[in-house]
Swiss-Prot record:
Gene Ontology biological process terms from the UniProt entry: mismatch repair
Any one GO cellular component localisation term in the record: cytosol
Function field: This protein is involved in the repair of mismatches in DNA. It is possible that it carries out the mismatch recognition step. This protein has a weak ATPase activity.
Lineage: Bacteria, Pseudomonadati, Pseudomonadota, Gammaproteobacteria, Pasteurellales
Keywords: ATP-binding, DNA damage, DNA repair, DNA-binding, Nucleotide-binding
Binding of ATP, residues: G613, P614, N615, M616, G617, G618, K619, S620
Stated name of the protein: DNA mismatch repair protein MutS
InterPro entries the record matches: DNA_mismatch_repair_MutS, DNA_mismatch_repair_MutS-lik_N, DNA_mismatch_repair_MutS/MSH, DNA_mismatch_repair_MutS_C, DNA_mismatch_repair_MutS_clamp, DNA_mismatch_repair_MutS_core, DNA_mismatch_repair_MutS_N, DNA_mismatch_repair_MutS_sf
Domain of life: Bacteria
GO MF term (any one): ATP-dependent DNA damage sensor activity
Similarity comment: Belongs to the DNA mismatch repair MutS family.
Pfam families membership: MutS_I (PF01624), MutS_II (PF05188), MutS_III (PF05192), MutS_IV (PF05190), MutS_V (PF00488)
Length: 864
């Protein structure tokens, strides 16, 4: 493609100038009823959107690749591109074709990006949509996140890139901005929507000035963020990007908040994955904690609940207030009346963001009107119950005058777009009513004119019509066209008819079109003025939306507690977990049979449990339910248990299951050890640690040694609250050697060749692993099971010789193998006998009668 603009047609020169201003993103260039893409953009869009790639003549002597999408269907195409991590510049015609000399003036009016999109059709309804900027300086990592659909603006500083990776895993931003010289780009490998930004966008002074201008402040001290200088650099970049893409004021972004790790219970990426909080191990959303807990009736409530789940808090006062509200809503039977009212509130949070961006559509305003209408009844049902609930209701506020405004201004069911009018209600503006009356009167006038012209000409096929290209016309069939009077001026010839215009009709057309144009222009002006009338109370409405979101979450949690038989947990300042009759919140919902509830007791004197028992016995479920019950307590939810007392926690770690990380070239064992190393370095005495089957990916002795050493480190060094599941029965001797360690096991019963899993947790070590019984259940051939039993009997015989020496009812795998040579065990496929060999060697067709007789005697002798 030739870059010299003088060699291109005027229109293509205009396109190339606009494209040069937006080089890294797709440019949707408005031409009539289509958005067109040219050159490389056309090729890329054709491949991504599965649309036709064509050519549009030539410019500068070269053919122009072209693809296009209809403007009225653009949202569907934008949604697909955004989901693929692409950004799109929307270029509109802003000039008047009638007065333009050369190409109509065009400009980019907005840039749609995955992280800054606010259109309802382009957003995941029940999931946050974030743009994040990350930055690193002198070993300190920082992340700033902005939710364009709510104005929520958060910053965090982190000690290392691993913590940053965990934070990205929690937030899952739709778009990530990073400096050109960012030193840890490898942590971004699995993310879409990556944007390299120039280093100057992260300069501290620039960032502070930009933030102060946005908030209308002279200092950031009032937000408590002035010392988080690395995070402020990231915040400056993300705000600059938002302003660059939206190209309008952002009044809903009016504050910034510093999130402190000390305020929350930390969960690393492995823990979020293993506990299946909002996403299951297969990448879906079913059978997750959120799937069970989230029955919120508003999308904004659903998004808030997911944030709570991913970031449990440590503020006991705030947790108790949440519990009080849940308790009260249950006892006062307010769940049923509140939920339908909240449902009618809808997604007020995102509607307000579109109001702030002046991109709200007519139906957004009717939804806002409906939401505001619910507020008095919501307040009536929620106030005067508890101080905590009253504080929430007070935040909702009163917007009756705005509701009345929207009721006067917008018709009951408006069209989707303001583009063609018909949105502003009759009686709202007198001038608009006059223009509309003039337009509406055209119908009667045209009917009268048609009757009059038929009578005057005697042409019974004469009729008056209108189209957007030729305006009003008088149509006469070809068979009667010769009767047209001399003053009829031909306007258009069709196959079966002629169309004419007369001065009277032309005069009236000009008058009506002027009325329609004036009516539409005034209606658009009045619609824009509505934003000005709503804007002064935007901040208050945002606070109301936040309160309504929280009320929706708490009402939802009250309903879940009531429906699922959850109890209110208590908190202790001492470390420990004491759960009686605990249940796994997800598994109990998918089981057909009743869930077997189990207890757990951990404290400073009993802080590590060695968990043994058969495969499929429920060890992983048991450990996960303890973590999930603890996490649920720390979001303020009631929990699935008979009772629960949860002590102070700072982190939850899990090392459960592993698979090869092929993308990073790491084996299963390497993944396992990396996760274990993170736990051993980061865990404290206030951490809850779940370890399942450490050391399986290497040799028996290596694995056992590592498992033993890790358990001993956790028991003696960190003294974390730990559940350590293992099939290495040697570890069951740890309680006799270390303080604070105890054995528990998942019970099972064996009957003949079958096994029954009791799924109940008992004190003490398991007596055996039941591995052969589980293998038989899995369908392993009986011959293989029989061979395994022979091998097991031999190993158990050896084990008895070490029982006294090592005081282990299971024997000791570390020493048993050295005691004696393994005797020959009957092979799975028996060797052939001499008789069988002799019989196989005989070929009857080759034997003479004498040889056959000799062979028979030989076989008889072998049998004897």
């Amino acid at each position: 493609m030739t870059q010299d603009l003088s060699k291109h047609t005027p229109m293509m020169a205009q396109y190339l100038q606009l494209k040069a201003q937006n080089p890294d993103i797709l440019l949707f260039y408005r031409m009539g009823d289509f958005y067109e893409l040219f050159y490389d953009d056309a090729k890329k869009a054709a491949a991504l959107l599965d649309i036709s790639l064509t050519k549009r003549g030539a410019s500068a002597g070269e053919p122009i690749p072209m693809a296009g999408v209809p403007y009225h269907a653009v949202e569907g195409y934008l949604a697909k591109l955004v989901s693929l991590g692409e950004s799109v510049a929307i270029c509109e015609q802003i000039g008047d074709p009638a007065t333009s000399k050369g190409p109509v003036e065009r400009k980019v009016v907005r840039i749609v990006t995955p992280g800054t999109v606010s259109d309802e059709a382009l957003l995941p309804e029940r999931q946050d949509n974030l743009v994040a900027a990350i930055y690193e300086e002198k070993g300190v990592f920082a992340i700033a996140t902005l939710d364009m659909t709510s104005g929520r603006f958060l910053i965090t500083e982190l000690p290392n890139k691993e913590a940053l990776a965990a934070e990205l895993q929690r937030l899952l931003p739709a778009e990530i901005l990073y400096a050109e010289d960012f030193s840890a780009a490898e942590i971004l490998n699995n993310y879409k929507g990556l944007r390299r930004r120039p280093v100057w966008e992260f300069e501290l002074v620039t960032a502070i000035n930009l933030l102060n201008r946005q908030f209308g402040t002279q200092s950031l001290a009032g937000f408590g963020v002035e010392k988080a200088v690395v995070a402020l650099c990231a915040a400056g970049c993300v705000l600059h990007y938002a302003q660059e893409t939206q190209r309008t004021a952002l009044p809903h972004i009016n504050s910034i908040h510093l999130a402190q790790n000390s305020d929350t219970i930390l969960l690393d990426a492995a823990t979020r994955r293993n506990l299946e909080l909002t996403q299951n191990l297969a990448g879906g959303t079913e059978n997750t904690l959120a799937a069970v807990l989230d029955k919120c009736v508003t999308p904004m409530g659903s998004r808030l609940l997911k944030r709570w789940i991913h970031q449990p808090i440590r503020d006991l006062e705030k947790l108790k207030k949440r519990q009080d509200i849940i308790d009260t809503l249950q006892k006062e039977q307010r769940i049923e009346p509140l939920q339908p009212l909240l449902q009618n509130v809808g997604d007020m949070e995102r509607i307000l963001a579109r109001v702030a961006l002046r991109s709200a559509r007519p139906r957004d305003l009717t939804h806002l009107r409906t939401a505001l209408a619910q507020l008095p009844d919501i307040a009536k049902n929620a106030k005067n119950l508890t101080a905590s609930l009253d504080a929430l209701v007070a935040q909702i506020g009163d917007f009756s005058e705005l509701h009345a405004l929207l009721k006067r201004a917008i018709i009951e069911t408006p069209p989707q777009l303001i583009r063609d009018g018909g949105v502003i209600a009759e009686g709202y503006n007198a001038e608009l009513d006059e223009w509309r009356e003039l337009s509406a009167g055209a119908t009667q006038y045209l009917e009268n004119l048609e009757i009059r012209e038929r009578e005057a000409t005697g042409i019974d096929t004469l009729k008056i019509g209108f189209n957007a290209v030729h305006g009003y016309y008088i149509q006469i069939s070809q068979g009667q066209a010769h009767k047209a009077p001399m003053h009829y001026v031909r306007r258009q010839t069709l196959k079966n008819a002629e169309r004419y215009i007369i001065p009277e009709l032309k005069t009236y057309e000009d008058k009506v079109l002027k009325a329609k144009g004036a009516s539409l222009a005034l209606e658009k002006q009045l619609y824009d003025e509505l934003f000005d009338l709503l804007m002064p109370r935007l901040g208050e409405m945002q606070l109301a939306a936040m309160a309504l979101s929280e009320l929706d979450v708490l009402t939802n949690l009250a309903e879940r507690a009531e429906s699922l038989n959850y109890v209110r947990p208590t908190f202790s300042l001492q470390r420990g977990v004491n759960i009686k009759g605990g249940r796994h919140p997800v598994v109990e919902q998918v089981l057909k049979d009743p869930f077997i509830a189990n207890p757990v007791f951990l404290n400073a004197q009993r802080h590590l449990l060695v968990v043994t028992g058969p495969n499929m016995g429920g060890k992983s479920t048991y450990m996960r339910q303890i973590a999930l019950i603890s996490l649920m307590a720390y979001i303020g939810s009631f929990v699935p248990a008979d009772s629960a007392e949860i002590g102070a926690l700072d982190r939850i770690f899990t090392r459960i299951g592993a698979s090869d990380d092929l993308a990073s070239g790491r084996s299963t064992f390497m993944v396992e050890m990396t996760e274990m190393a993170n736990i051993l370095h980061q865990a404290t005495e206030k951490s809850l640690v779940l370890i399942d089957e450490i050391g399986r990916g290497t040799s028996t002795y290596d694995g056992l040694s590592l498992a033993w050493a890790c358990a001993e480190w956790l028991a003696k060094k960190t003294q974390s609250l730990t559940l350590f599941a293992t099939h290495y029965f040697e570890l069951t001797s740890l309680p006799s050697q270390l303080k604070g360690v105890a054995n528990v096991h998942l019970d099972a019963r064996e009957h003949q060749d079958s096994i029954v899993f009791m799924h109940s947790v008992q004190e003490g070590a398991a007596s055996k692993s039941y591995g052969l019984a589980v293998a038989a259940l899995a369908g392993v051939p009986k011959q293989v099971i029989q061979l395994a039993k022979q091998r097991l009997a031999h190993l158990e015989e050896i084990s008895l010789q070490t029982k006294e020496a090592h005081d282990n009812p299971q024997g000791d795998l570390l020493f048993a193998a050295d005691l004696q040579e393994t005797p020959q065990i009957q092979p799975l496929v028996a060797q052939q006998s001499e008789l069988e060999k002799a019989l196989i060697s005989i070929d009857p067709d080759e034997l003479t009668p004498r040889q056959a007789l000799e062979a028979l005697y030989r076989l008889k002798k072998l049998m004897a």
